[in-house]
Amino acid sequence: LSLISGIFKNADYTMERLVRVAKKLRLEHNFNGYIHLKSIPGASDELMREAGLYADRLSMNLEIPTESGLKLLAPDKNHQDMIKPMGFVKNELIQYKEEKKKFRSTPKFAPAGQSTQVIVGATQENDFQIIQVADHFYKNFDLKRVYYSGYVPISNDARLPAIGAQVPLVRENRLYQADWLMRFYGFQANEILDKNNPFLDLEVDPKMSWALRNITQFPVIIQNASLELILRVPGIGVKSAHKIVMARRFQNLSLEHLKKIGVAINRARYFISVSGENSHLKFLNALNLKEIIVADTKSKFENPFSNQLSLLHDDSFLR
């Protein structure tokens, strides 16, 4: 259940009513399900604290990723109004966890943590800027998730994309994949993109793009490579990587073994050395390796501006 509201009268007035609804659901209607409450920028600390006692997750949506973009569209707003509550919630989460260790009766506070959302494509930020922002909030505010939403043109404002402009859904999806790499695959933001490569490749996923730019790190010898290195092989997901580490203790692994484990062989085979023949390694240093892989791999999104987007953002994108 998501509790969301536009601001009316003022921040505290609106936030108080959101908290009242969450409290009523919990105490009067005995609702024990998941509640995600979108906090109101500028609301008091007291209301933020009370919200965390009744909601499973709190979110403060950043919306526009950079201060310059926000100033362009909303000169009267600033990121600090959104960042300050995130800092408060982070400190409250730490405090309640410490109290819980001492007193079992301590109530839960936002047990599912906090999240934020950024709009993609409304202003001129590149993907490098966006994932740097996400990385900052993950590291400094202990966010559980950053959500990315492609901008849907609904206004004739000249500062925004024109009505009828395509929604960049593949770009949105690539950002989710890059986010997944940072959270679960051990990638740093500045490894995925940099100032010389500020946009994510729409033809291949971010892990494949990284591999193609760092071809000297391959092939990975599956039989003795570290888990961290195996996780960087295109086509190998987190679960498959752990299965590989376990399985190789008992036998030398071939492409057929990896396929049974769940590895996406059509991508991984260009980057790994295994027991038995792997004829695809001959393409590793080919100048047109990307074209070979793209031609050999049916894209999940044939049109980068498709009107349909999968709701699943998991490591199946990056296997």
What does each model-found stretch correspond to?
Residues D81-V89, G121-P206, V220:
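A structural motif corresponding to the C-terminal lobe/cap of the Radical SAM core domain
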Residues L200-L229, L255-R319:
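C-terminal extensions
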Residues A247-R248:
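Residue-level signature of tetratricopeptide-repeat
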